[in-house]
Curated annotation (Swiss-Prot):
Protein name: Movement protein TGBp3
Transport listed as a keyword: yes
Family classification: Belongs to the Tymovirales TGBp3 protein family.
Known role: Plays a role in viral cell-to-cell propagation, by facilitating genome transport to neighboring plant cells through plasmosdesmata. May induce the formation of granular vesicles derived from the Endoplasmic reticulum, which align on actin filaments.
Cellular component terms per the entry's GO annotation: host cell endoplasmic reticulum membrane; membrane
GO BP terms, alphabetized: transport of virus in host, cell to cell
UniProt signal peptide: none
InterPro entries registered for this protein in UniProt: TGBp3
UniProt KW keywords: Host endoplasmic reticulum, Host membrane, Membrane, Transmembrane, Transmembrane helix, Transport, Viral movement protein
Compartment(s): Host endoplasmic reticulum membrane
Amino acid sequence: MLPKMQPSAQCLIVFSLAFVLGWYVLRPGNTSCVLLITGESVRLVNCELTKDLVEAVLLRPLKHL
């Protein structure tokens, strides 16, 4: 069984894990592109602004439903 940990240590572990996962997803060498859709907006996250992407957005802008 695992020993009990202090709440501050648990908090540090959780924030460290979130930071590492966030860094992995948003690192410069990552080629994935994420479309984040919320009730307020539509965002492209971690995408390179290539000429093709800019032309696609200009030709067919994203609309709210």
